[in-house]
Amino acid sequence: MLNLKTQQIQNQIPEKVLFNFQSATMKKLSILLMLFFFINILAGEKLGYALSGGGARGFAHIGVLKVLEEEGIHPDYIAGTSIGAVIGGLYAMGYSATELEEMCLKLKWNELTRDTHQRKDLYIGQKRWTPYGNAVFELNESWVPQLPSSVFVSNNLNLELFKLTASASQIQNFNELPVPFMCNATDLLTGEGVTFTEGSLMQAVRASISIPSLFEPFELNGHYYIDGGVSQNMPIDLLHKMGADKVLGIKVNSTLRDMERVNNLVEILDQTINIGITRNLKEH
């Protein structure tokens, strides 16, 4: 029998990974986990994890995965959106929750948005996904500079994802990963959700995490993709398509802000995205 007591879960989830989770939220989570997994173990059915998007809050996924691991619970399938695609993809590759936690604590997050690199120091494969400049300004037909497509240029983000997923670079079918995996993104031109089940894991994850206005849309095979959370932030449907009988959905996206917390560009962008995500979750 599982023994997922409220206090036990709160003690085991690392504070540095948990960020702004409130104790009330964790109490609800612990109760749901007890009920869900008690039924699931008795039934012996296939289990899938659905990891939502949620920006910085998304790293709370790692804390939840760590507790589940310690209870001997492992998924048969994983699907992720945005930051959930990053965590889910790496977990599907075989990284443990502890390894993911250590990785996140060591990573220099500020460097991901400071695109100061020397192109001559990059491998050929890395150059393929890295723009030539650190600040990109496009010109229109009249040779007039246009505003950039995003606040940040994602050179270093692309390179970091390239490094993290390098060991899976030869795997073209995500069902062949240690844990079968799917992630989703949104087609910028049609607004339709797109599911990635094969190809480059790095590209699939990068497409899913293209937060509008913060990172430029990711171009792949003539299509431009933005954050998967815009079309479906909780990829439960993907897991049912993979064959999961039971699904644990881990939702970590931000709640809507009040007026006192919508004061700058980033906060307004975050609020705008979360309005769409909140509406999307209600529809699904």
Model-identified regions with their sequence ranges:
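Patatin-like phospholipase
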Residues: 2, 43-81, 89-284
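N-terminal processing/targeting junctions
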Residues: 8-10, 39-42, 74
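General helical structural elements
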Residues: 12, 31-32, 61
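Enrichment for repetitive, rod-forming helical segments
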Residues: 19, 34-35, 64
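Extreme N-terminus of proteins, especially the signal/transit-peptide cleavage junction
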Residues: 24-25, 40-45
